[in-house]
Amino acid sequence: MSFNNKKPMIKPSVFLADGCRVIGDVSIGDDSSLWFNVVCRADVNSIKIGSRTNIQDNTIIHVNHKGPKVLIGNSVTVGHQVILHGCKVKDQSLIGMGSCLLDGVVVGEKSIVAAGSLL
C-alpha cells in the first residue's frame, strides 16, 4: 500500500500471508515471507528486509520520524508477536517470540535474542 507517494518494493518471490500490511517505503528481498497479520509501517522513514527472511505472525515493524531506519538482514527469523522499532538486525539472526527491540538497537550477525526480551 502506498503512503505519501512511497510505494513498497516487494520481489515477486516474496510470500505475504492473509492480513499482512506493508505500507510506505518498505523493500523486501527475494524469497522472504511475512506471515499472518504482520504490519510493516514505513510511513515516516524506511524499512528494508533482506532475502530469505521470515517475519512471523502478528509482528509489528515501525520507524520513528527522526530516528533510525529499520534494517533487517538476510536469512533472519523474527518470531511471533515481535515489535521492531527503529532497529537493525544483521544477517542470520533469530529474534525470539514476543521480543521488543527499540530505536537504535543493533543485533549482531548470527545472534539470538531470547523470547520475551526487551532491548
Q: What is each PLM-predicted segment?
A:
Residues S46:
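Phosphate/pyrophosphate-binding betaalpha-module
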Residues M1-V14:
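Extreme N-terminal tail/first-helix region
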Residues P12, A17-D18, I23-G24, G29-D30, ...:
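Left-handed beta-helix
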